[in-house]
Amino acid sequence: GSIGMIGDTGDPTCYEFGLQAIKKVGGLGVAIIKPRSNEEIIKRIRMAEEAGAVAVGVDLDGAGLVTMKLFGQPVGPKTVEDLKELVASTKLPFIAKGIMSVDEALACVEAGVNTIVVSNHGGRVLDYCQASCDVLEDIVKAVGDKITVLADGSVREGVDVLKYLALGAKGVLVGRPLIWGSIGGRKEGVTTIMNTLKSQLSQAMILTGTDDVKSVSNKIITK
């Protein structure tokens, strides 16, 4: 299955429009917030709760986004204590996005985070950093039995989803292709992209002898 995510940007109206979309579909959505001050994040968590979101989170690597500075929106890194405060502020599952090391993943476990997303923000926050697929397996080995691990980055075809699942992710986030689909074809464009990814994933599973997305063997990956 799939579920939509909305984001927080330098333009505050973007987050508000996203929450409206979550309301429109009866709460079937996740709100991801930039690493602002905890006070500002908690305000946005309350807005997400009122919209009926099923989960909230913070994309921690957004601390380095130039676009936030251009809009005069202060962001910064979070400590374990900061994360503990955010986790305690809501009854919704809390997601930490932008995790790229075992140490960061362990810090999230300590803070009580429910889910992490292994992600380098599409390579847009730090040049020359590793790709998500380079670090995912080690992170899963370290914390996969303690916390839900998702991943994203360069997912362009269904086989890319299968690769991440084989490396240990429990789910995969897709961004750019869906944006392209929405700009070019609105709702129908997004539906086409999703159906294409699903078809490609199914075909890749057949050709690798994979019966279930919940039990993808890492033996199908060549390193």
Where does each model-flagged region fall?
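Glycine-rich beta-to-alpha transition loops that act as phosphate-gripper elements at the mouths
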Residues: 35-36, 95-102, 129, 148-161
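Charged helix-capping and loop-helix junction motifs
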Residues: 73-76, 130-136
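Conserved, mostly hydrophobic/aromatic
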Residues: 58, 86, 108, 116, ...
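Active-site entrance/lid segments in N-terminal catalytic domains of soluble metabolic enzymes
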Residues: 1-106, 110, 122-125
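Short beta-strands and strand-loop turn motifs
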Residues: 59-60, 117-120, 176
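Conserved mixed alpha/beta catalytic, RNA-binding, or beta-rich assembly cores of soluble enzyme
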Residues: 120-123, 144
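Alpha/beta catalytic cores of nucleotide-metabolism and tRNA/nucleoside-modifying enzymes
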Residues: 133-223
